[in-house]
């Protein structure tokens, strides 16, 4: 309502014509009452310490008062003042002053017009271009690594297995005692038979201590050819051809040892490995041959074997493969054979440069960058997250490599050209052209970088246009070769690089990723610093020009901002005179809230800046002035302006601003709500982007495994094939040898030849005893054998009984036969017969018919002759019986000795004298 009343009072003439008279009178009465109330308020000037709310309320009250005064066109007591020259000293009361804020950095001060020091602004600043001068070229990069995979080639081994098998036999079982295998090399003359006809001989000989020992297949004692057939066992790397799949063994006699021989020709087609520098090679079985696989008898390749056992055959004819008689043949330009004690090894000799390559392609980078540093080149690949560092010395891939008699890079040159052409046609054919020739560099990590530079077609056309118009165009790619001047002639020099220390080169690829990380960080930091330096220089240049021009308007403020402290300055021609400002008593400063100028109660003009009253330090005199920028007090109150309608002014004091509406204080405004004029030059710095490193595998697991010439897998597989090839005897020979026999055999063999012979004898006896015992035990445990044994026991008991009952008939069988009559020496009839010498006289009676009656004398009476015999007589009788037994046995022996052989006719004629005797006449069944 007060603002409406104020506007109504200011335009009363126009408003009276358009509104009713009653409203005009009511406004005048209201304004008069407010002016009287304000004039009656007494005032002193205390140190006001009101907050923002009280100040706002005071401002609203005083706004209404000033409006009423204006309406009545009367001078208000607040504007009663005295004029001293051009300075108006205002009257101050507690409702029209306020305390300033933020005087720490910019205290209240008075800057004098008199200056003593002279300063000036410099000339225009020249900004240096900080663009890096590092030449950069884009292109195609192919990276090659050292080939660590071993050279693998085919090797044929020839040997004969002389297999000796020993066994022992008793009555029921054959015992297998063991096998010994002797490997013997093929003689060189027999290799032709094997390689050309797929046959080998069945005999083998060996010289031991100057003696020749010969072994024959199946103990045949014949030397004939046998056909090679493929063995049942095979592997990925080896094929075996043999002549004997089943082993022969001759059974032993009972209680005897036997040993048989099998001759097996074995041809193995296998693989061998050799790695740089190719001084030896290793077979899949683990055999090491100290000869370079490329030694041909004329070159300087390593050779450490016995030359007497080494042969090289030129244009050698042999089978393409073994196992078939009808297999085709081939001609080998160079075939090498090495004879050892246990085998003969053969392999084909190839030129080294045709079958080996020291380098292998690792990565193809279609978009690569080459930067030229002071000491070398950096080949950067963002796709690989790697940087390869190389010297500027190029490698000539068209010349012979130092230390070798051939060019080691020719094997990769064609591949590189093909790869570069493929990438160029696929990605760059429409936009780029090739820049320069193919270049080769050796990196610090032992890699080979093949580089093909590229150039955009637009730049290429610009260079061609400049060349036609004799205008030089600076390119980013510097010359890659150095030149020396001799006698006015430019001579290009290139030094060969030695690869003798190739083994000392570190092949770890992690260094390349570390180098890439460093290059990325370096480029990022350098770009940021370059942007900062450029922005800083441009800002300094602009600021200097602006300050120079602004100093012509307000030199004090400009220099205060430059020196960051309050100073006073004024122009003195083309220079500036500067001096320090004088501080005032900070607690005595009062800022008035009303900026209007009244005369006779009427607003006649307005101050352009707020009024200030203050006191100097150590002074009690009240001074007046106007508030300048940053709390500067400008002496005098002559800075006025015409009052504007709807005026709004904000005066900055520290971090806040005093807001005046229609030249009267309204409130304290925070500067945060007032937008700043953006004079900051943008700093082009972006956060470092994330880089995920790729896992670069320079050599795969397969390559690392293949680089080792000793392949454990192949050696074990070859060993297993040998193990499976050893078979036991067939069912004819049972391996159930008792442990004690094996132990005894081992013990006796350890004693030498004599012990071996003793062992054979002991083994025979022990084996016989063991066989008998085992036979008896087996016979008794058999039912039939047990029954037979019982019958035999019964028979033996019967015989014993008969012997016991008839001892004379058993012991003296001839006593029951018809005896020859003994005639007495004196005649046919005599007294007592004369018996054997020393025998007692025997009485014999002879009948008239010539019959003997003596038997009756012994048998007629059971008591016999009534005669008593002494022990001496019994002894004489036993002796006589012994003599009689001996004479009978001798007689039978003489009859057998004198008996002539008789045939069937003699037997029929009756001339057989085989022991038959004619019966006596009295005993004959025939009558005469």
Swiss-Prot record:
Q: Low complexity: which segments have biased composition? A: 51-70
Localization (cell): Virion membrane; Host cell membrane; Host endosome membrane; Host Golgi apparatus membrane
| One Pfam family hit | Glycoprot_B_PH2
Q: Which stretches does the entry tag as region Disordered? A: 40-79, 826-863, 887-928
Sequence motif Internalization motif, residues: 916-919
Q: Where are the annotated glycans?
A: 93, 223, 315, 354, 398, 429, 470, 487, 618, 667
Disulfide cysteine pairs (residue numbers): 111-581, 127-537, 200-265, 357-411, 606-643
The region called Hydrophobic membrane proximal region is annotated at 729-781, 740-780
Check the record and name the InterPro entries matching this protein.
Answer: Glycoprot_B_PH1, Glycoprot_B_PH2, Glycoprot_B_PH2_sf, Glycoprotein_B_ecto_C, Herpes_Glycoprot_B
Compositionally biased spans, kind Basic and acidic residues:
853-863
**Where does the record place the site Cleavage?**
497-498
Region (Involved in fusion and/or binding to host membrane), start-end ranges: 167-173, 252-259
Enumerate the UniProt keywords alphabetically. Disulfide bond, Glycoprotein, Host cell membrane, Host endosome, Host Golgi apparatus, Host membrane, Host-virus interaction, Membrane, Signal, Transmembrane, Transmembrane helix, Viral attachment to host cell, Viral envelope protein, Virion, Virus entry into host cell
Q: How is it modified after translation?
A: A proteolytic cleavage by host furin generates two subunits that remain linked by disulfide bonds.
**What residue ranges lie in the Virion surface compartment?**
38-783
List membrane-spanning regions.
784-804
Can you list the GO cellular component terms from the UniProt entry?
host cell endosome membrane; host cell Golgi membrane; host cell plasma membrane; membrane; viral envelope; virion membrane
Q: One biological process GO term for this chain?
A: symbiont entry into host cell
| Subunit description | Homotrimer; disulfide-linked. Binds to heparan sulfate proteoglycans. Interacts with gH/gL heterodimer.
Q: Per the similarity annotation, which family is this?
A: Belongs to the herpesviridae glycoprotein B family.
Quote the function comment for this protein: Envelope glycoprotein that forms spikes at the surface of virion envelope. Essential for the initial attachment to heparan sulfate moieties of the host cell surface proteoglycans. Involved in fusion of viral and cellular membranes leading to virus entry into the host cell. Following initial binding to its host receptors, membrane fusion is mediated by the fusion machinery composed at least of gB and the heterodimer gH/gL. May be involved in the fusion between the virion envelope and the outer nuclear membrane during virion egress.
- Descriptive protein name: Envelope glycoprotein B
* Biological source species: Murid herpesvirus 1 (strain Smith)
